[in-house]
Amino acid sequence: METTTITSILDDNNNNNNNNNNNNNNNNNNNNNNNNNNNNNNNNNYNYKEWDNEMVCKWLHDTKRIQKVSIEIFKANEITGNYLESLTDKMLLKMGLTIRDLLSFRSEFDDLKNIFNETNLYNNIQKNSIDYSIDNNNLNNLNNNNNNNNNNNNNNNNNNNNNNNNNNKTIKAPTIDISQYVFIKQMKGSVNCSLEKYINKKTKERILIKRIGKSNINEETIINEISILCSIDHPNIIKTYGYYKDENYYYVASKFYPKGSIKTKSKSTPYNEINAKKVFGKVLKAIDYLHSLDPPIIHRDINSDNILFDENDEPILIDFGLSYKELKDDNNNDDDNYDNHNHNHNHNHNHNHDNDNDNDTNVKIKTQCMEPRWPSPEIHREPPHFSKESDIFSFGCTLFEILGYIITTPIIILPSIPSGMSLECQILFNETTKIDSCFRPTSKQLLNFSWFKETALLTSSEPQPLEPQPQPKPQTSQSKPKPSSSLSSSELPPQPPLESQSKPKPSQSKTQPTQPQSKLNPSSPPSSSSSSLSEPPKPQPSQSKPKPSSSLSSEPPPLEPQPKPQTSQSKPKPSSSLSSSEPPPLEPQPTQSSKPQPSQSKPQPIQSQPTQPQPTQPKSSKQQPQSKQQQQQQQQQQQQQQQQQQQQQQQQKSKPEQSKSKPEQSQSKPQPGQPLQSPSKPQPIPSTTKTTTTTTTTTTPNNNNNNNNNNNNNNNNNNNNIITSINLIECFKKNNSKIIISKDMEFDNPYEKTLHEKHLLKLGISDCKQININHKYFKKVLSFLNSHLTSALQMKMGPYQVDIAPEFDNIFKTLFISLVLEKIDKDTLLKGGKDLGDTSSTLILYTFYYFLSNTLIYQIILHKPTSFKLVGKLK
């Protein structure tokens, strides 16, 4: 009995164990069926050592962190899975990976190795557990419980996923009753996607409604857009009221802002840094709010048209979302001044950049709409990469635009920072417009910049003193005496009467007998000249005052004991500079400097009694300057005629003849004896010796000024003629503004020649051609390329020294000329250098293409050369 019972119990236990094992196997099979993807990844996908090149490229693409350019480099070098561990940083940089892709590759590969090691450990543990499960019933029971729990968890996860998918289609945004609104007009758009204006029947409130066709875009993306737009709550972001849908369209309602954009406001009232700081500080807070959401929202097209003002003059950031990308500007006229919304631009936000569906929709919609006004360099990659850093780039360009330093044209070149900008603003612009997005600050970091703080108000007002600089009155009084003293000290005598006028004006403001006399003087300038000739004693006292001034100008010590003449001399000096064109009266006066020395005692008692002699002196003093004004006009006309004659004579004369004229100039100064006869004689007799002396003296300063201007222009031209490491400019100079392209160019090896011939054939250039290029246009583009090409190559190649290959020079020549001739369009330009040669030259060629596309040089070259303008400060 005992044996039977024991055997029966053992048999029962064995049967139970077999049943449990069968159940476990069934459960495992079910789990395997439910999780085929995970098991395949654990068994096959994560075994990277057995991957071929195609699997490696697929893995890099699935990471969504590595650019397509780097994936093509892995594909071109035929890197398989067993080589992944042996790739060092130096090798990756030489291959052409950027620093960002290198870091992304390292992090992704570390995760891959960890998963691979974990799967191996799991498989080993599972094998060991199977071995021990034959003898251990407890382990079987535990496995059964674990498998049951896993099944329940899988079922729960599936149910949750189904519930989430169903919930995603429900919009949380409030609905609006479209019947309560009356259609006014369609502002922008087409039949399938448009921007319309409505007004409420009761409240008369105007709203904007975006009408989006369901057939144009995926319904789930529209639902996500509307739900997230309605959830945004920020005082500086456009308010979305709700939505309405019918069988064919979605209607999204938002607030209407009639005050217009900051672009139109800046045209009427230009912004300085203090005012711009208040506006853009709030705009930056709105951007930071969008970037801090989970998932973050990326605006994608921040510009001056998308910053509006509400009724309280608060800035409002508008127009973002995938559903608005297809809006096109069909109606250019807008009666209600709302054309500044510009919803036709490409303003989008990316809720989750890690999803394939989102990226696909972004790329598709990107091809159907206009490009952003201020696109960052990474947007022009294939595929375009939008990120938070692209918003920072657009923000910096918009700020620079509102301050008046960028011309708002489709051609974009980042200019050199002007000197009038404050240091804090220069730092902000430099940081926000970095070529590599990795080095741009975040929105939170920008808010901590010194330019946005109150302490920067003093420094931000530094560029404003550029406007009040033109102050002619105070500056001329001080700046003009310097040239007068440098030219000759004899210019002072004819101007002291102005001193007597200038003195009584501040001292005796009530007595103004001079004003009626000034009206009479214009009618009697010749009489004054005749009276001055007939009455020698009168001009002597008038000239006696300046003569000590002339002696004072030559002798500084007597200036100290006479404070009054010093003040009087400071005022006539500007007039002397004005009368610098009058050489004849200036030269004869030093000859009389010996005579009026006793007359110096006369003006002193006159100064002691200013009440009596002053009314008599200003009469003669006013007559003289007025007569001088006419004389100046006459002399200027004579000088112009004489200059023309001299120019003709100089062309005919030889150099020794010009040397003879120099001693005549040296002798002309002591010859003139009468100061007042010289201006009267040159009128009827332009060919006398005295006139020749005057012409030589008058033309020399003008010639010097012309020479100085010419020298300055030459210096500016020399600054533009920058010789670079590229031999293109030298070739350009040797061929007299022409570049010769031929198939017989010299090459170091046959590979370069074949590569060059392939490129020429691709461009359609089979014979030798001589092509004319605008010199200024060519020089500006090359100077810009030279300043940024090295940095772009270093960014692409890594922190190593970049040596431009000789084939790069030749291909650069043909490429530039082909772009000017419009032999290459934008699409072929962005393909890269992979079609022009082998992998050894692909890197350097692609770098050049990449640089051109990122800096938007192709937009300049593909346009007409006349449309090319250097960016500068708006006037």
Curated annotation (Swiss-Prot):
Main location per the UniProt record: membrane
GO molecular function: ATP binding; protein serine kinase activity; protein serine/threonine kinase activity
Top enzyme class: transferase
Reactions that this protein is recorded to catalyse: L-seryl-[protein] + ATP = O-phospho-L-seryl-[protein] + ADP + H(+); L-threonyl-[protein] + ATP = O-phospho-L-threonyl-[protein] + ADP + H(+)
Annotated region described as Disordered, given as residue ranges: 1-47, 136-170, 331-362, 461-718
Biased composition (Basic and acidic residues): 654-663
Active site positions, chain numbering: D301 (proton acceptor)
Location(s), subcellular: Membrane
Biased composition (Pro residues): 555-564
Keywords assigned by UniProt, alphabetized: ATP-binding, Coiled coil, Kinase, Membrane, Nucleotide-binding, Serine/threonine-protein kinase, Transferase, Transmembrane, Transmembrane helix
Coiled-coil ranges (or none): 135-162, 626-655
Biased composition (Low complexity): 13-45, 136-168, 474-554, 565-581, 589-611, 617-653, 664-718
Entry membrane topology: Single-pass membrane protein
Keyword Transmembrane: yes
Transmembrane regions listed in the UniProt entry: 842-862
GO cellular component: membrane
Biased composition (Polar residues): 1-12
Domain Protein kinase: 181-452
Domain SAM: residue ranges: 51-116
Designated name of the protein: Probable serine/threonine-protein kinase samkC
UniProt lineage: Eukaryota, Amoebozoa, Evosea, Eumycetozoa, Dictyostelia
